[in-house]
C-alpha cells in the first residue's frame, strides 16, 4: 500500500510520510533513565500520541511499558478511585496480554491477571490494594516499568484521578523504600501540574496540584524546516514530482511554523488535490484549508467560546496591534500558550503561526460582517476592483479613503487610530473572498505600523498600514516598505496612512526608488 500524509491518530513509518522524531525520543528516554516523572502538554494534534507509541517501541528492550489512554473511558470509570483503579489495571492487561516470549512480561501478565480475577465481580480495586498491586508488579518484574497515559485531559476534573495521582506521587517520594514505576508520563493539552487551572476569576483550587514531582518535556515538538524537508524528500523519492524540496519546506513552514497537524494537512491537500508542489499549490492548499470545518478549527472555536479572555487577547493583538509582555504567571497568557495559540519571542507575545492567525481574522471579521458598513461598501464595489484576474489596488485604496472619510470622519481620533486598520480588513475581505487570502506580517504588527500581504491568484500585494507620525517617520516607513519589496521581489507596494492632521493632502502620490514604486493614500 502506498504511503500517505497522515493527519489523524498515530503515524507509522511504513504507512505514512513522517518526520524523524528519534532525537525527541532519545531525550525522553534519558529522562526515564534518570527516573523522572514527565508531563507532555501540547496543543491539539501536535504529535503526542505518535510520540508515545514510538517511545514504547524504543523502550521495550530495556523496560516493560504500559501505554494506555483515557480517551475512550466514560464517566463511570471515574466514579470513584476504586473504579478508576480497576479501569487502569484492565487497560494495562489489554496492552500486555498478547505479548509472548518475554519473561518480564509473563511475570507482569500473571500479576495483572490475578488482580483482575480477584476484583472482577465488583470491578473495583480499593486504593490501598491498587498501591500494593503497583509495588508487587514493580518488585517482581525483571525489568523496570514505565506507565504512559495519553489524553489525561479527559480525567483532569475528576477527584478520583487526582487521588490516583496523589498515590503515584506518594510512591514516587518513597521509592527508595517501596517499589514503584521507573517513570510515569502524562500527556495532554493542559499542563497537568496545574490540574485545576482555569482562566475565569471565579475558579477555585487553581493550583491544587498533586503532580508537582514531574518535569515538563520542553523540547520543541514542532517540525523544523529540516524535518519537513526530510519528509518531503521521502515523498519525492516515491513520486518524482521535481519539486524544489528546500523551497517548498520553507514555504510550508512560513505558513505553519512547523505545527505538525498543519504541515501534514497542507501536504495532504497538495497531494490529494493535485495542486502542484510549488508556491501556487501551497497558496491554493492554504485557501482550501481556511475554508474547511475540521476538528482542529472546531477545537479553536470551542476554546474561544470557553475562554473569552483568550479571545479578547488574540483580538487585541490582531486587530489593534497591542503588544503584551510574556508573563507565565498571567493566567490568560499561560493558557493561550498551553493551547499553542501564542508563543514567547524576545519577551513578547506572538501568534503561533500564520494559519491560525488567518483563521482568527476570518472568525473575528465574520462576527462583524453583517453589521459592518465597511464590508458592505467593499462588497458593493467589488466588480470595479478586479480586472483580468488582478486586483486594482490603487483604486481599492482610493475608494476606501473616500468611504472611510465619509463614514468615520467625524469620529474621535482615538477611535480611528484603534479601528482604522480593522475597517480596511473588513473592506478588503469581500473583494478577495473565495479567491485570495491575506495575512499580517507579525514583526510589524504594532500600534503604528502593520504590513498586510495579500495573495490573489498567484500575485502578492503588500500594503503598509500606519499612523501618520510626521514626515521623517513617514520616510522611514517608505524605506522599510522598499526593503520589503526587495525581499518579496515585488516592484510595486502600497501605503495606507491614517492621518489626523486637518491640513493633510488626501490625493494619492507615488514614490519611486529605482525600478520600484510605492503608491501612498492618506486617510
Language-model features: where?
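Active-site metal-binding core of divalent-cation-utilizing nuclease and nuclease-like domains
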Residues: 430-458
Amino acid at each position: 500500500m502506498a504511503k500517505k500524509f497522515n493527519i489523524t491518530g498515530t503515524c507509522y513509518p511504513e504507512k505514512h510520510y513522517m518526520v524523524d522524531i528519534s532525537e525527541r525520543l532519545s531525550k525522553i528516554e534519558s529522562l526515564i533513565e534518570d527516573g523522572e516523572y514527565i508531563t507532555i502538554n501540547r496543543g491539539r494534534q501536535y504529535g503526542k500520541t505518535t510520540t508515545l507509541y514510538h517511545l514504547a517501541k524504543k523502550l521495550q528492550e530495556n523496560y516493560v511499558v504500559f501505554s494506555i489512554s483515557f480517551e475512550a473511558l466514560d464517566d463511570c470509570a471515574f466514579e470513584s478511585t476504586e473504579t478508576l483503579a480497576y479501569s487502569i489495571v484492565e487497560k494495562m492487561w489489554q496492552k500486555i496480554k498478547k505479548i509472548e516470549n518475554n519473561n518480564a512480561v509473563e511475570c507482569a501478565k500473571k500479576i495483572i491477571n490475578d488482580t483482575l480475577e480477584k476484583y472482577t465481580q465488583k470491578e473495583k480495586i480499593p486504593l490501598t490494594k491498587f498501591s500494593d498491586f503497583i509495588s508487587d508488579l514493580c518488585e517482581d518484574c525483571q525489568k523496570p516499568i514505565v506507565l504512559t497515559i495519553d489524553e489525561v485531559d479527559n480525567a483532569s476534573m475528576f477527584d478520583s484521578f487526582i487521588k490516583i495521582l496523589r498515590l503515584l506521587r506518594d510512591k514516587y517520594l518513597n521509592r527508595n523504600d517501596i517499589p514503584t514505576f521507573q517513570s510515569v508520563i502524562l500527556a495532554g493539552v493542559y499542563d497537568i501540574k496545574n490540574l485545576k487551572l482555569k482562566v475565569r476569576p471565579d475558579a477555585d483550587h487553581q493550583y491544587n496540584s498533586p503532580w508537582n514531582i514531574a518535569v515538563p518535556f520542553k523540547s520543541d515538538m514542532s517540525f523544523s524546516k529540516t524535518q519537513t524537508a526530510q519528509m518531503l524528500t521521502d515523498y519525492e523519492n516515491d513520486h518524482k514530482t521535481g519539486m524544489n524540496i528546500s523551497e517548498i519546506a520553507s514555504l510550508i513552514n512560513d505558513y505553519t511554523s512547523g505545527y505538525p497537524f498543519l504541515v501534514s494537512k497542507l501536504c495532504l491537500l497538495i497531494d490529494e488535490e493535485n495542486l502542484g508542489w510549488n508556491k501556487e499549490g501551497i497558496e491554493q492548499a492554504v485557501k482550501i484549508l481556511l475554508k474547511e470545518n475540521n476538528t482542529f478549527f472546531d477545537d479553536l472555536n470551542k476554546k474561544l467560546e470557553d475562554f473569552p479572555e483568550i479571545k479578547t487577547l488574540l483580538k487585541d493583538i490582531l486587530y489593534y496591534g497591542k503588544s503584551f509582555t510574556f508573563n507565565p504567571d498571567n493566567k490568560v497568557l499561560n493558557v493561550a500558550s498551553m493551547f499553542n495559540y501564542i508563543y514567547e519571542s524576545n519577551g513578547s507575545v506572538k501568534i503561533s503561526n500564520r494559519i491560525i492567525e488567518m483563521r482568527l481574522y476570518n472568525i473575528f471579521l465574520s462576527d462583524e460582517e453583517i453589521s459592518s458598513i465597511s464590508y458592505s461598501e467593499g462588497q458593493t464595489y467589488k466588480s470595479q476592483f478586479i480586472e483580468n484576474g488582478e486586483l486594482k489596488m490603487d483604486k481599492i485604496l482610493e475608494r476606501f479613503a473616500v468611504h472611510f472619510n465619509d463614514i468615520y470622519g467625524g469620529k474621535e481620533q482615538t477611535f480611528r487610530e484603534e479601528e482604522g486598520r480593522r475597517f480596511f480588513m473588513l473592506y478588503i475581505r469581500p473583494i478577495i473572498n473565495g479567491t485570495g487570502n491575506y495575512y499580517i506580517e507579525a514583526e510589524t504588527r504594532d500600534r503604528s505600523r502593520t504590513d498586510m500581504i495579500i495573495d490573489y491568484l498567484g500575485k502578492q500585494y503588500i500594503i503598509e498600514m500606519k499612523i501618520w507620525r510626521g514626515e521623517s517617520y513617514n520616510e522611514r516607513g517608505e524605506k522599510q516598505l522598499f526593503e520589503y519589496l526587495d525581499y518579496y521581489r515585488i516592484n510595486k507596494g502600497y501605503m495606507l496612512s491614517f492621518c489626523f492632521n486637518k491640513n493633510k493632502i488626501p490625493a494619492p502620490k507615488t514614490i519611486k526608488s529605482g525600478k520600484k514604486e510605492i503608491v501612498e493614500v492618506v486617510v
